[in-house]
Amino acid sequence: MKVYCGYIGEEHLEKNVILNGWVKKVRKMGNLVFVDLKDRFGIVQIFATKSDGVFNELTQLSREDVINVEGLVLLRKNPNNDLKTGRFEIHVKKILIYSKAKTPPLIIEDETDANEEIRFRYRYLDLRRDVNLKIFELRSKVYQAFRNYLYSQDFIETETPILAKPTPEGARDFYVPTRTRKFYALPQSPQTFKQLLMVAGFQKYFQITKCFRDEDLRSDRQPEFTQVDIELSFADEIEIQTLIENLLKYVFKQTINVDLTTPFMRMSYEQAINDYGSDKPDLRFDLKIKTLNTYFENSKTLFFQKALLNNQSIRAILVPNINLNKKQVQTLEKFAKDKGAKGLSWISIKDEKIIDGSLLSIQEDHIIYKTIFKDFNLSTGSILLVADTFDIASQALGLVRINLASILNLKKPNIFKFVWIIDWPLYEYDNEAQRFVAAHHPFTMPTLETLNTFDVNKKDARGRSYDIVLNGYELGGGSVRIIDQQIQRRMFKSINMSDEEANLKFGFLLTAFEYGVPPHCGIALGLDRLMMILVNSEYIRDVVAFPKNNNGVDMMLDAPSNMNDEDLKELGLKIKND
């Protein structure tokens, strides 16, 4: 009978079995040869004696050879308790060598000797490692759990086109030239398609789909990524948020056996920026940001005086019971400067005595720092300060906060802190373009309070948007959609899109609004980011089977690559060298 290597058990004793797998280790011991044979499901020991006809073939095997063997299952004289199959071994009678393997360029074990470039160039070998196989087994279970729950709630799974038109989603599009001298764009999201499915009467739609964004890459980004896309008719924010909470509760229970507590916390965008300096706060630890302007009204420190004179903010993180050192603060200061801060000031206190810091020289201000610590009930600890505009100080300390938590080991991997970020601005100001742009996308419905003035008073306009954040990562975002053609046209005009341009780009959607549109809302959940968190990885490429590196390059395929002149000519394209 054919059996997987990892499934050999008591029921197979004294029976002939057929196994297939990869050779992991060959050990010749006198008149015996032992081979560790592995498949996806586990590893088992096989052996032959010198008198067996297969002895020589087994001794000549190499690591990663792919073989088929037939033999008798026996109890091992010296069991290996570290293996699930460690009580058994197979006495081989027949062997078929499917394929011989060269010496691999990396050690195919959980702990490998290869750097990332080698691992990704030979990704098919890297994926043989158990640590990677387990990631993709879990990923498969996550897919199944999402589908099972949404099917149970009467959702229709529907594919939408990959070859589409450009959309104003905030990142650059990938374009696909055609032989007709026209271009498709790969979708940054199925946004307009899923809204049209609501017009079509689907009411409950989802798909697990690929999306594409030609943007700067980070550890949690890939140019192509997978999202669970959901849209729901005759529903509002509360209904879809409740749906997503129940969905994630089911997925976590089914995949990693974790019971999530619902409902999730809700926090306004303004509160997130005020307290955490980020619209995706990590709530596994405290370290809230405080505004301390009133403490420094009589400060003798020049840059504090200047900040208050210019109506700027003095913001701080208080670190209880920990005395940071100069090296740690210098590391954190680099992150503050990355967000535009001029520097990161600090003071450390122990048993109510100032012991270290960058602000020691001005003795008159020591009473200020002692008062701050006293008011926050701290006799020992550190304080990190940034004096700048409110936005710069908040963003700088937000990034400092995240990296401080890493230094202090506060990011516990098995704690899952969800939060809904709500009450979003409808627009954000693009300093480079010198104008307001849609904060999420231009299909978001303004709040009732700002509906009449959203396109005039853009700074105060609010949208019916919501992001779901998990452990400092934006897991997903969504909104209640505009369903009125006139409101949609106002929104387009407010982001400098003329009626002519709107008709050219979105005429199909505007026309659909003339034929009866149900109120609807939706969300897209980043499946890759969810997988990052589930397996406690810092890099999205660890949970993608064939990822791109930080430069957007597929090391295995050497893609993107140049096109030959003949193909360019057929498409009517010419590459212009800078």
Curated annotation (Swiss-Prot):
An annotated GO BP: aspartyl-tRNA aminoacylation
PANTHER family per record: ASPARTATE--TRNA LIGASE, MITOCHONDRIAL, ASPARTYL/LYSYL-TRNA SYNTHETASE
Membrane in keyword set: no
Record has Aminoacyl-tRNA synthetase as a keyword: yes
Family: Belongs to the class-II aminoacyl-tRNA synthetase family. Type 1 subfamily.
Protein name: Aspartate--tRNA ligase
Sorted UniProt keywords: Aminoacyl-tRNA synthetase, ATP-binding, Cytoplasm, Ligase, Nucleotide-binding, Protein biosynthesis
Chief place where the protein resides: cytoplasm
Region (Aspartate): 191-194
Catalysed reactions, as listed in the record: tRNA(Asp) + L-aspartate + ATP = L-aspartyl-tRNA(Asp) + AMP + diphosphate
Annotated positions binding L-aspartate: 169, 213, 440, 481
EC main group: ligase
SUPFAM superfamilies documented for this protein: Class II aaRS and biotin synthetases, GAD domain-like, Nucleic acid-binding proteins
Task of the protein: Catalyzes the attachment of L-aspartate to tRNA(Asp) in a two-step reaction: L-aspartate is first activated by ATP to form Asp-AMP and then transferred to the acceptor end of tRNA(Asp).
GO molecular function annotations of the record: aspartate-tRNA ligase activity; ATP binding; nucleic acid binding
Highest rank taxon of the organism: Bacteria
Assembly: Homodimer.
List of residues binding ATP: 213-215, 222, 474, 526-529
One Pfam family this sequence matches: GAD
Organism taxonomic ancestry: Bacteria, Bacillati, Mycoplasmatota, Mycoplasmoidales, Mycoplasmoidaceae
Catalytic activity, EC: 6.1.1.12
CDD domains: AspRS_core, EcAspRS_like_N
Organism name: Ureaplasma parvum serovar 3 (strain ATCC 700970)
Residues annotated as signal peptide: none
GO cellular component: cytoplasm
Location in the cell: Cytoplasm
HAMAP family cross-referenced by the UniProt entry: Asp_tRNA_synth_type1
InterPro entries: Aa-tRNA-synt_II, aa-tRNA-synth_II, aa-tRNA-synth_II/BPL/LPL, Asp-tRNA-ligase_1, Asp-tRNA-ligase_1_N, Asp/Asn-tRNA-synth_IIb, AspRS_core, GAD-like_sf
